[in-house]
């Protein structure tokens, strides 16, 4: 029996929500370990659509325990709004089935404002953030001035913490010629949040260790994708946290040895939101068609996603940086009907062939994809639930992807419905 980490193997939006929901049926606990409410995902269950951003996918299964780990940055108001929306849809959410790490960093209104100010200050310096305060909150965490959930349990300690926080933020506000934040107002807001949030507070590392020793199955749910990792992604066009699989340990307080299987999620093509390099991007009618078929718009922001062919170089790189054991390939059905399909198998950089994406921003912008053409298929793959339901050429495409990225396909998704999944290897039994 293995505890399983699920990570995006591209730039996010790979369909992690559906796969995590599908796997959560076999898990006892589902844990978020990084990011915030900037990465939304949609789940379709029995015809009902649910949109999640901050909450783990496990909340949709009442018998499971969901956990938000210390690696997450936590927006109190966004949390309460999301809980209310799901409760209105009939989803039961309470401290009985949801716990939040007591040492999680809080996102405050000042973080959201700073995020927006920076992003909108100049198009030349914009990196495409969601303006939800994620980056500034992580900055305060690393700068050792963040307000954490546990601080709400002892309100008397908050004033000096707020003063320390504002010593930094009000200096920035003055630089923007904006009025300073009022410490009293922030204290008032945090005081109001305390009774609503503290019932969920938990010493998460201890809770998970106890559950692990009891033999419970733990599913670690990543947000965004490995190519947005602050260290290993396309810097500076990345998120502000580590999104690779190793963060599952750091972001929950579990040791690395507790992770038994890493499942990477990737689309049968590639998408990206916002700025940054994208070697296989299609700016033609084919790219538009993939976007229309795949409904490639952000769950939270509604932003249109850039679309391109499958990039085996990038996914192979992610397989290495995340230690991925198996891949879940999603949205294969979007490629139905194309006469031919291109797959990137390498790059040319300044006249030389390379087998990875360089770390430098300048070099990243100069790489040119080397494509291999694969014959398409006319028969539909949508809603397939076994290999026998797939066209022969679609199976050849999947097998070629496996060869190029050096990793087996463990799951194949053919629609947003959780039942439309072909299982090759069960990650919990690997």
From Swiss-Prot:
E.C. number(s) listed in UniProt: 6.3.4.4
One biological process term in Gene Ontology: 'de novo' AMP biosynthetic process
Cited SUPFAM superfamilies: P-loop containing nucleoside triphosphate hydrolases (SSF52540)
Gene Ontology cellular component list: cytoplasm
Cofactor note: Binds 1 Mg(2+) ion per subunit.
Catalytic center residues: 13 (proton acceptor), 41 (proton donor)
Keywords: Cytoplasm, GTP-binding, Ligase, Magnesium, Metal-binding, Nucleotide-binding, Purine biosynthesis
The keyword Ligase appears for this protein: yes
Reaction(s) catalysed by this chain's protein: IMP + L-aspartate + GTP = N(6)-(1,2-dicarboxyethyl)-AMP + GDP + phosphate + 2 H(+)
Pathway(s): Purine metabolism; AMP biosynthesis via de novo pathway; AMP from IMP: step 1/2
GO MF: adenylosuccinate synthase activity; GTP binding; magnesium ion binding
Keyword GTP-binding: yes
Protein's cellular compartments: Cytoplasm
Binding site for substrate: 299-305
Enzyme class, broadest EC rank: ligase
The organism's place on the tree of life at top rank: Bacteria
Described function: Plays an important role in the de novo pathway of purine nucleotide biosynthesis. Catalyzes the first committed step in the biosynthesis of AMP from IMP.
HAMAP family membership: Adenylosucc_synth
Family as reported in the entry's similarity comment: Belongs to the adenylosuccinate synthetase family.
Subunit and interaction comment: Homodimer.
Record protein name field: Adenylosuccinate synthetase
Gene name in the database record: purA
């Amino acid at each position: 029996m293995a505890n399983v980490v699920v990570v995006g193997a591209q730039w996010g939006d790979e369909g992690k929500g559906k796969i995590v929901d599908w796997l959560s049926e076999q898990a006892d606990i589902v844990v978020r370990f990084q990011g915030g409410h900037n990465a939304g995902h949609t789940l379709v269950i029995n015809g009902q659509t649910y949109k999640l951003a901050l909450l783990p996918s496990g909340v949709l299964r009442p018998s499971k325990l969901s956990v938000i780990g210390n690696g997450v940055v936590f927006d109190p108001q966004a949390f309460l709004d999301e809980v209310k929306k799901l409760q209105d849809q009939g989803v039961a959410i309470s401290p009985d089935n949801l716990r939040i790490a007591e040492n999680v960093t809080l996102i405050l209104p000042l973080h959201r404002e700073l995020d927006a100010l920076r992003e909108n200050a100049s198009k030349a310096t914009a990196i495409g953030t969601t303006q939800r305060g994620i980056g500034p909150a992580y900055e305060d965490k690393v700068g050792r001035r963040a307000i954490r959930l546990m601080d709400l349990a002892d309100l008397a300690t908050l004033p000096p913490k707020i003063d320390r926080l504002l010593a930094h933020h009000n200096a920035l506000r003055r630089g923007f010629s904006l009025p300073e934040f009022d410490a009293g107002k922030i204290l008032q807001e945090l005081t109001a949040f305390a009774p609503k949030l503290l019932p969920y507070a938990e010493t998460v590392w201890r809770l998970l260790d106890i559950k692990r020793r009891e033999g419970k199955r733990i599913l670690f749910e990543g947000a965004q994708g490995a190519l947005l990792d602050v260290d290993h992604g396309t810097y500076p066009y990345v998120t502000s946290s580590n999104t690779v699989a190793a963060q599952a340990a750091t972001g929950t307080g579990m040791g690395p040895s507790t992770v038994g299987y890493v499942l990477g999620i990737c689309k049968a093509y590639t998408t990206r939101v916002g700025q940054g390099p994208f070697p296989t991007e299609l700016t033609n009618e084919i790219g538009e068609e993939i976007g229309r078929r795949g409904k490639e718009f952000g769950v939270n922001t509604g932003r249109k996603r850039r679309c391109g062919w499958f990039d085996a170089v990038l996914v192979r790189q992610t397989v290495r940086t995340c230690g991925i054991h198996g891949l879940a390939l999603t949205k294969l059905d979007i490629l139905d009907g194309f006469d031919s399909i291109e797959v990137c198998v390498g790059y040319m950089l300044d006249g030389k062939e390379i087998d990875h994406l360089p770390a430098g921003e300048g070099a990243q912008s100069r790489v040119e994809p080397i494509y291999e053409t694969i014959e398409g298929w006319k028969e539909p793959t949508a809603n397939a639930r076994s290999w026998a339901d797939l066209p022969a050429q679609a199976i050849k495409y999947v097998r070629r992807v496996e060869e190029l990225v050096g990793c087996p396909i463990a799951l194949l998704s053919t629609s947003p419905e959780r039942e439309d999944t072909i299982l090759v290897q069960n990650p919990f039994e690997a």
